[in-house]
Amino acid sequence: MTGTRILELFGPAPEPPSELGRYRILSPTAGIRVSPLQLGALSIGDAWSTDLGSMDKDSAMELLDAYAAAGGNFIDTANAYQNEQSEMWIGEWMASRGNRDKMVIATKFGTDYRAHELGKGLAVNYSGNHKRSLHMSVRDSLQKLRTSWIDILYLHTWDYTTSIPELMDSLHHLVQRGDVLYLGICNTPAWVVSAANTYAQQQGKTQFSVYQGRWNPLRRELERDILPMARHFGMAVTVYDALGSGKFQSRDMLARRKDQGEGLRAIYGGQQTALEEAMSKALGVVAAQHGIESVTAVALAYLLAKAPYVFPIIGGRKIQHLHDNIEALSLRLSQEEIEYLESVGDFDPGFPYDMAGVDPADTGIATPIVAQAAPMAFVQRSKAIGYAESSKGSQMFG
């Protein structure tokens, strides 16, 4: 009996209910294990239903249950989402399910999260990057989430009004106290993050281990400086707007939404642009190559193939959409497929990359200043888990 127990203890875990439960290391500087797709909780709540659609508490609990049942453990929220309902409902869900220790919760500070109750202009120190805002936000998030710690705390947006030493010293204090485990930053220029992490490393403080930003096949600005910066500092990248604000949809999907009385989210505009329609068609072509219909799965697979330590955030309000998105984890996109999707848009890295070139570790091609000296060969950087060396249908992308 004892031997059996020992074998069970050290034996492998069973296969997960879906690929969502095949966990990954968050980043080289954050060893916590997380699901490859993060559940975005922007829609958890009904306070912003006019702009984001309606989701009552029962539906929210069902969505959270479905995500967890599929093996998901990684949830993204913020202090202000849905006028604080998002954090409160997640906290209520974890308390009722008794699963706090199983979940990895990321939340954010920096926005004015109390104006909805106190009034505009009457909650000035509830927002900003400064120590007082941070103190109150973490105090309140812990209470709303019904937890004693936050797994990942993001600075929501850089506001240029707080010094890097004040920010990093204050964040490090929370880590030392055990209120926060890992640090992240969103919507911030690469030079600021670089300066902050350099300060942290030099002063023996906790650095940012994850960056959150906008990225999809039509919005590739993150690749210019933020992605190389994240790689340099050992940071993960969590991605919002991965599905083009919900506009990467086939004509059939849009027709079904219309038949069901649903439109695109009002806050993002009610119609696809010509470029969004073209991208949706291209995503459909790649989906067909893989024998599936879901263009959203391909859009997510694109990000998962681009670089290691990338975690798309999936939002939405329907369980069926969740399962469609999980399909992305079974896809592997080739370089030909990636380039085919990127050919729809127009991304120019600009100066100084048009002069200096890009890292040969990514391309295998020497930069002009290196090539002028001698022929060179380069060790290639590791590819993402979602990357495939070749595609059976690659000839159609030529």
Curated annotation (Swiss-Prot):
Biological processes, Gene Ontology terms: austinol biosynthetic process; dehydroaustinol biosynthetic process; terpenoid biosynthetic process
Keyword Nucleotide-binding assigned: no
Keywords from the UniProt entry: NADP, Oxidoreductase
MF terms (GO), sorted A to Z: oxidoreductase activity
Disruption phenotype: Impairs the synthesis of austinol and dehydroaustinol and accumulates the intermediate compounds preaustinoid A4, preaustinoid A5 and austinoneol A11.
EC number: 1.1.1.-
Positions bound to substrate: 156
Superkingdom per UniProt: Eukaryota
Binding positions (NADP(+)): 76, 186-187, 212, 241-251, 317-325
Active site: 81 (proton donor)
InterPro entries from the UniProt entry: AKR_Detox_Biosynth (IPR050523), NADP_OxRdtase_dom (IPR023210), NADP_OxRdtase_dom_sf (IPR036812)
Broadest EC class assigned to this enzyme: oxidoreductase
Any one Pfam family match given in the protein's UniProt record, by short name: Aldo_ket_red
Pathway: Secondary metabolite biosynthesis; terpenoid biosynthesis
Transmembrane segments: none
Stored Gene3D superfamilies: NADP-dependent oxidoreductase domain
Note: In A.calidoustus, the austinoid gene cluster lies on a contiguous DNA region, while clusters from E.nidulans and P.brasilianum are split in their respective genomes. Genetic rearrangements provoked variability among the clusters and E.nidulans produces the least number of austionoid derivatives with the end products austinol and dehydroaustinol, while P.brasilianum can produce until acetoxydehydroaustin, and A.calidoustus produces the highest number of identified derivatives.
SUBUNIT field: Homodimer.
Family: Belongs to the aldo/keto reductase family. Aldo/keto reductase 2 subfamily.
Function: Aldo-keto reductase; part of the gene cluster B that mediates the biosynthesis of austinol and dehydroaustinol, two fungal meroterpenoids. The first step of the pathway is the synthesis of 3,5-dimethylorsellinic acid by the polyketide synthase ausA. 3,5-dimethylorsellinic acid is then prenylated by the polyprenyl transferase ausN. Further epoxidation by the FAD-dependent monooxygenase ausM and cyclization by the probable terpene cyclase ausL lead to the formation of protoaustinoid A.
Record protein name field: Aldo-keto reductase ausK
Organism this protein belongs to: Emericella nidulans (strain FGSC A4 / ATCC 38163 / CBS 112.46 / NRRL 194 / M139) (Aspergillus nidulans)
